[in-house]
A protein has these predicted regions:
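Feature 926 captures the class I aminoacyl-tRNA synthetase adenylation module centered on the KMSKS loop
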Residues: 1-21, 25-27, 33, 71-109, ...
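Substrate-binding cleft of carbohydrate-active enzyme catalytic domains
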Residues: 66-67
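Structured mid-domain segments that build the active-site/substrate or prosthetic-cofactor binding neighborhood
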Residues: 119-122
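Cytochrome P450 heme-binding Cys-pocket and its upstream "meander" loop
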Residues: 32-41
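A short glycine/serine-rich beta->alpha loop
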Residues: 44-55
């Protein structure tokens, strides 16, 4: 080929440069640096972060680093988010020929953008491979997005009933009850955590913090506060509940907006823009929430966390005893690092349906211990004393022996004038629970349920079951939340007598204005309540 300028013969230069050179030159080549745009380049260099898939480790990541180091003796980026490859459900590479490839547009149409985004945020660290399949996406959608939406829907339902307008009230923190202060403390703690995690590119950690908060907001705060929203009128306690939940929903939506942009925008538009036309146009134009440090109460959060552990253990003890939560129990004993105040014990009692919660320094009296020698360790140590050790262990006071073992780390026995010192690894320890009591423990917390049921407790259990069945029938019959009803019952003299004696209590629980015993009408259903057959009916007034 001839040169168009001079007419001479052109020759290919012998040097060859890798095509990745162009990608590595991107930071300065895009600005024609150093020939122009010097200030603009220096303002943008190095980049805060770059992101690409893991195969770019030897490609773009390397070429950027190599060229920048040669030219500027400096890395061209401060952070790198490496993305693992998306695989199928079995961990195989997606391929059209294998038939395991997922069309992203089909997935978006089926699950929605937010659900897919959330799956990638919370599933694993960004640099690990992701096994993408519908069940995993739907599980994340249910646990976080579904819970957040249901909490939002709960608020909207009752706010509409009460014509609640958040712009007409202020959140008076100093006069809030403990449960409200706890939620606001957790809210600001999680905003702080998410902000810190995102600033440090810890994506799954920030997503998990959001999910944990939404779960506690829904399954603890809202569940514990429902009756405050159901109250008649607009008393201050009800206003406090509305304002606390409103603040939490709006704030957590702003914190989650970068991850689930569409759902949070919907929540923001309905909760904020619908009542305040002067509010910022979109949640994505709002600042990230600012942490109110003065609202963070770590002691309160720790106390509530311990309370939740006690409740979980109490539920486990109920399951072990095979006693449903609607059946009241007389007493629960708790051993913990510190005794909790009346506010907390009242919550525990209500959650676990027990009449009394007692803190005890020791619950060993409800547990018995028996010991046998661990032959593989005791045999070589003490040989001919083994039979004597076995006999001594069978006769020992189990509680005292266990206390000695925990205190000193050893159980000391006198075997015919010979001292035998046994550590925990030398012993086979069996525990048995005292009849009528069930024990559960986790770390430093132990709970004991007294499972002995008096006739009064059994009667109350029947009433709670009846209330539950009527509430179920209200839903099945399609009644609205605030509909007044008429209750009917027949075909079980024992239960009818109980319903007669507890008529007002039952009616108030299910929004009933009347009760007729001996006949049925409306929506009718047969039930077996604690092995007692009965026919119940509900009709809208």
């Amino acid at each position: 080929l001839k040169c168009p300028e001079c007419g001479g013969i052109m020759h290919r230069v012998p040097e060859v440069i890798d095509c990745w050179f162009d990608s590595g030159a991107m930071p300065f080549a895009q600005h024609h640096y150093p020939f122009e745009n010097k200030e603009l380049f220096e303002k943008q260099f190095p980049a805060d972060f770059i992101s690409e898939a893991v195969d770019q480790t030897r490609g773009w990541f390397y070429s950027l680093l190599a060229e920048s180091t040669i030219l500027f003796n400096q890395a061209p980026y401060e952070n790198v988010i490496v993305l693992g490859h998306v695989q199928d459900e079995n961990g195989q590479k997606m391929s059209k020929s294998k038939g395991n490839a997922v069309d992203p547009f089909d997935a978006l149409e089926k699950y929605g953008a937010d659900a897919i985004r959330w799956y990638f945020y919370i599933n694993s660290a960004p640099w690990l491979p992701n096994r993408f399949h519908g069940k995993a996406v739907q599980e994340g959608q249910r646990k976080f997005m579904g819970t957040l939406w249901n909490t939002y829907a709960f608020f909207v339902l009752y706010a509409n009933i009460d014509n609640f307008d958040a712009t007409k009230y202020t959140l008076d923190y100093d006069n809030l009850p403990v449960m409200d202060k706890w939620l606001l403390s957790k809210l600001n703690s999680v905003v702080k955590t998410v902000d810190d995690c995102l600033a440090n590119y810890k994506i799954p950690e920030s997503a998990r913090a959001l999910q944990e908060f939404v779960d506690e907001m829904s399954n603890w705060y809202v569940r514990r506060s429902r009756e405050r929203f159901w109250a008649k009128g607009m008393e201050q306690d009800k206003i406090n509940a509305y304002m606390t939940l409103y603040t939490a929903l709006v704030t957590i939506s702003k914190a989650a907006a970068p991850m689930i942009p569409f759902m949070t925008e919907e929540i923001y538009q309905n909760l904020v823009r619908s009542i305040d036309k002067e509010a910022i146009e979109s949640i994505h134009l709002c600042d990230f929430p600012e942490v109110k440090e003065e609202w963070i109460d770590k002691e309160l959060e720790d106390d509530m966390e311990e309370l939740l552990k006690i409740v979980v253990l109490g539920r486990a003890a109920r399951n072990t005893a095979n006693i449903k939560n609607r059946q009241p129990i007389g007493t629960m004993y708790v051993k913990a690092d510190k005794e909790m105040g009346e506010f907390y014990t009242d919550i525990i009692a209500d959650e676990l349906n027990v009449k009394e919660v007692k803190f005890a320094s020791d619950v060993e009296s409800f547990i018995s211990y028996s010991f046998k020698p661990q032959l593989r360790t005791v045999g070589p140590k003490y040989g001919k004393l083994l039979n004597g050790i076995r006999k001594a262990l069978s006769e020992i006071n189990g509680t005292e022996a266990m206390n000695e073992l925990r205190t000193t780390g050893l159980l000391t026995l006198d075997i015919d004038g010979n001292k035998a010192e046994l550590s925990e690894e030398d012993l086979l320890i069996e525990t048995a629970q005292t009849e009528g009591y069930v024990t559960e423990a986790d770390g430093d917390i132990s709970v004991v349920l007294d499972t002995n049921l008096t006739p009064e407790l059994i009667e109350e259990g029947f009433i709670r079951e009846i209330v539950s069945k009527v509430q179920t029938m209200r839903k099945e019959a399609g009644f609205e939340v605030m509909d007044k009803i008429h209750i009917y019952a027949k075909d079980n003299d024992k239960l009818l007598e109980l319903m007669k004696n507890h008529k007002e209590e039952i009616m108030s629980e299910v929004l009933a204005e009347d009760m007729t015993l001996g006949t049925t009408d409306g929506y009718v259903k047969e039930w077996n309540i604690n092995k007692e057959p009965v026919v119940l009916g509900v009709a809208k007034m």
